[in-house]
């Protein structure tokens, strides 16, 4: 989720349009250079690309790994990520493992990331309005459009959903804001669920507690787009994080794992360099800020401040998002070593949701946030649980 926040200060020093010498490509393993279609093709999946248009005009990329159309599964990525995160482990990745088991796999890219930086009439480079969104808009427009598109394409009435990190947040919001979609979901498997952020670990807690300052800094720089895949910040990431040994020690061991939790043995150096070729994939300042607000208050709509809240919502405070309305079957899977989606917070979520059919705390105790999508042994430790849930609630 908020993986790159510890280095947000670096972004303050970088103009989004700045040119940085980009000489690190040679250090990127092949899987770090391939895009989603390239990776899917390399690992033997029959792949399609679909463009879907939301009701508010965003053009989203939806990838399809062709399988049995009576068994559709939608994968929702986390913040600053893209659909790539579900295929980076190649033959042992979740996307490839699902399609090998016959599932019809669809992968959404929400507005603003590397694949969905398009709109019918707004220019992401010049129109601030393009970036006026958070996970609420992902729910109301992006995921709902993807669900409808997939169901129409397959002829099915329901589908399964697997979300990771913020990909779970937007699914809860969907069930609340568009309750009719609860009936379109067979089961929502929530990996590293993010809804409450009251018990994040020290480094992440400091970030959440200072989200107001981070937001103000980005506002001063007029940075409505954050950590774009095509920005100087991404080039800086490549130069710094993809260098052999130095990049691994600096970025993964020095920044990412202290924030997310996890065991370095699960994200080895060679894979780390490939993964960093796909990350960060971009988001909006507002989305980053809204997620940070989850640690400061209840699960609610975006907080603009009392004056603007009054104009937008008619109240001084933003309306709460009522989790009691999320009636879709939900499985919660949390890692004991996760510093972002903590066991204490996910237990609170379990108690708030009305239809939790399975709650799992993953071992070992070092199982961190990124283990869910990037872990070397996740296909062995967690995937069998997912497959069992999909089969049970088919």
Residue ranges of predicted features:
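Cleavable N-terminal signal peptides of Sec/SRP-targeted secreted and luminal proteins
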Residues: 1-18, 123
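Alpha/beta-hydrolase-fold enzymes
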Residues: 18-19, 152-157, 166-311
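N-terminal cap/lid segment of alpha/beta-hydrolase-fold proteins
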Residues: 34-67
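Short, surface-exposed "cap/lid" segments of acyl-processing enzymes
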Residues: 54, 63-123
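Alpha/beta-hydrolase active-site loop
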Residues: 128-152
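Short beta-strand/loop motif that positions the catalytic acidic residue
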Residues: 326, 332-334, 338
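Short alpha-helix in the alpha/beta-hydrolase fold that links the catalytic acid
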Residues: 328, 342-352
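Catalytic active-site module of serine/aspartate enzymes centered on a nucleophile-bearing elbow/loop
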Residues: 357-394
């Amino acid at each position: 989720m908020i993986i790159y926040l510890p280095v947000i200060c670096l972004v303050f020093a970088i103009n989004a349009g700045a040119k940085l010498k980009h000489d690190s490509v040679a250090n990127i393993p092949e899987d770090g250079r391939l895009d989603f279609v390239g990776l899917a093709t390399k690992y033997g999946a029959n792949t399609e690309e679909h463009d879907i248009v939301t009701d508010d005009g965003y053009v989203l990329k939806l990838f399809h790994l062709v399988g049995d159309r009576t068994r559709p599964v939608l994968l929702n990525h986390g913040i600053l990520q893209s659909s790539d995160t579900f295929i980076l482990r190649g033959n042992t990745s979740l996307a490839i493992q699902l399609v090998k088991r016959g599932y019809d796999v669809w992968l959404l890219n929400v507005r603003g990331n590397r694949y969905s930086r398009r709109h019918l009439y707004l220019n992401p480079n010049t129109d601030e309005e393009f970036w006026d969104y958070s996970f609420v808009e992902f729910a109301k427009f992006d995921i709902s459009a993807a669900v409808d598109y997939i169901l129409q394409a397959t002829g099915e009435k329901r589908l399964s959903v697997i979300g990771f990190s913020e990909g779970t947040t937007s699914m809860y919001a969907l069930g609340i804001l568009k309750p009719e979609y609860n009936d379109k979901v067979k089961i929502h498997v929530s990996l590293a669920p993010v809804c409450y952020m009251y018990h994040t670990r020290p480094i992440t807690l400091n970030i959440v507690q200072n989200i107001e300052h981070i937001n103000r800094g980005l506002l001063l720089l007029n940075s409505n787009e954050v950590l774009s895949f095509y920005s100087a910040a991404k080039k800086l990431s490549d130069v710094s994080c993809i260098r052999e040994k130095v990049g691994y020690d600096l970025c993964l061991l020095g920044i990412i794992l202290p924030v997310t939790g996890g065991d370095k043995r699960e994200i080895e150096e060679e894979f780390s360099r490939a993964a960093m070729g796909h990350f960060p994939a971009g988001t909006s300042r507002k989305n980053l800020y809204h997620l940070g607000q989850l640690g400061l208050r209840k699960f609610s709509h975006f907080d603009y401040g009392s004056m603007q809240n009054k104009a937008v919502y008619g109240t001084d405070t933003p309306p709460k998002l009522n989790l009691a309305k999320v009636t879709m079957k939900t499985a919660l899977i949390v890692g004991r070593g996760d510093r972002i989606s903590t066991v204490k917070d996910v237990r609170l979520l379990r108690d708030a949701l009305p239809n939790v059919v399975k709650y799992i705390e993953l071992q070992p105790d070092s199982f961190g946030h990124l283990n869910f999508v990037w872990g070397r042994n996740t296909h062995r430790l967690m995937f069998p649980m997912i497959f069992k849930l999909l089969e049970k609630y088919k």
